[in-house]
From Swiss-Prot:
Mg(2+) 2 binds at residues 235-236. SUPFAM superfamilies: Nucleoside phosphorylase/phosphoribosyltransferase catalytic domain, Nucleoside phosphorylase/phosphoribosyltransferase N-terminal domain. The gene is trpD. It comes from Shewanella baltica (strain OS185). This is Anthranilate phosphoribosyltransferase. Signal peptide: none annotated. Anthranilate 1 binds at residues 91, 122. NCBIfam families: trpD. The lineage of its organism: Bacteria, Pseudomonadati, Pseudomonadota, Gammaproteobacteria, Alteromonadales.
Length: 357
């Protein structure tokens, strides 16, 4: 008889049965603490994938990772009803398209328009340049201390939280994930485990089949309001086609589609949004944020920032949010914000505030 406390839970999975939320949290807790062998880890991830993860299982895995994350000292939530929480603009990645850094650029625009944005991100998954790769080009310290990040959020309306800096236990799964060479539950967990615990989310997923399930997971995790989107192949709101949406609001989930016309912008081609290496994408982002980007680039960023502004209550519709985002882009305020964030990040390093992080 096995003395391994997690073996009975693994056996349930091997029988093709589901675990409840608490059981899944127990399994992933063991993984994060380094108490699970690579063989067991692979067996667990494959068993979940082959059957299809339930809402409870995804929520339980997120619970475990949230509980184990490095704490983030959130600044006091503003009592102003238009600024009553934090928003994240995030995607699962893995959509297979090499686009410009839309969600990261949109985060600067939304913050410059008044939203409190805590952007949780990582290095590239499917593109040549992930959010962290882009920010590094601007001299923004990816591993700034939680205290420095919190000060940035409070003073600048924006901070960037580098996932590996807050979720150290995930390192135990890296060899297995690399060896499996297939998507697993980890591919959808990233956006769900932001240590700032945002009340509002614009969350893009790589598959249309994930839109409704992930909205249900966000509801289970206590998210106040969210839009989960898949845009014609992209893990974000699409400029080149329809976007499938599951909107969580007041405890209810409503499904619908958005077109570029609904957002007040013209249709573009996916090729208009093709990105490159981090250095090239940084130049594109700089041009957009200075109000000098191409129409397609500006619109792609604006519709995503606009949906985030709608989700967090600053705009009363996605179209109004998009218009506000476009005006913010033209003002150049978003680039000023990027420059300020890079300056604060650099000063913290020079002053030694990042020691012991």
């Amino acid at each position: 008889m096995s003395t391994n406390p997690i073996q009975p839970l693994l056996d349930v999975l091997y029988q093709g049965k589901s675990l409840n939320r608490e059981q899944t949290a127990e399994l992933f807790g063991a993984l994060i603490r380094g108490e699970m062998s690579e063989a067991a880890m692979a067996g667990m991830l494959v068993a979940l994938k082959m059957r299809g993860e339930t809402i409870d299982e995804i929520s339980g895995a997120a619970d475990a990772m949230r509980a184990a994350a490095k704490p983030f000292p959130c600044p006091e939530r503003n009592n102003n009803p238009l600024h009553n929480g934090i928003v994240d603009i995030v995607g699962t990645g893995g959509d297979g398209f090499n686009t410009i850094n839309i969600s990261t650029t949109a985060a600067f625009v939304a913050a410059a328009a008044g939203a409190k944005v805590a952007k949780h991100g990582n290095r590239s998954v499917s593109s040549k340049s992930g959010s962290s790769d882009l920010l590094a080009q601007f001299g923004i310290d990816l591993t700034m201390s939680p205290e420095t990040a919190s000060r940035c959020l409070d003073a600048l309306n924006l901070c960037f939280l580098f996932a590996p800096h807050y979720h150290g236990g995930v390192k135990h799964a890296v060899p297995v994930r690399q060896a499996l060479k297939t998507r697993t539950l980890f591919n959808v967990l990233g956006p769900l485990i932001n240590p700032a615990r945002p009340e509002f989310m614009l969350l893009g997923v790589y598959s249309p089949e994930l839109v409704l399930p992930i909205a249900k997971v966000l509801k289970a995790l206590g998210t106040k309001r969210a839009m989960v989107v898949h845009g014609s192949g992209l893990d974000e709101v699409a400029l080149h086609g329809n976007t499938q949406v599951a909107e969580l609001k007041d405890g209810d989930i409503v499904e619908y589609q958005l077109t570029p016309a609904d957002l007040g912008v013209p249709l573009a081609q996916i090729t208009d949004l093709e990105g490159g290496e981090p250095a090239q994408n940084a130049l594109i982002t700089e041009a957009i944020l200075k109000g000098r980007g191409t129409e397609a680039h500006a619109n792609a960023v604006a519709i995503n920032a606009g949906c985030a502004l709608y989700v967090c209550g600053i705009a009363d519709s996605v179209k109004a949010g998009t218009l506000l985002a476009l005006a913010t882009i033209q003002s150049g305020k978003a680039f000023e914000l990027l420059s300020q964030l890079a300056k604060v990040s650099g000063e913290a390093l020079v002053n030694g505030q990042e020691k012991g992080r």
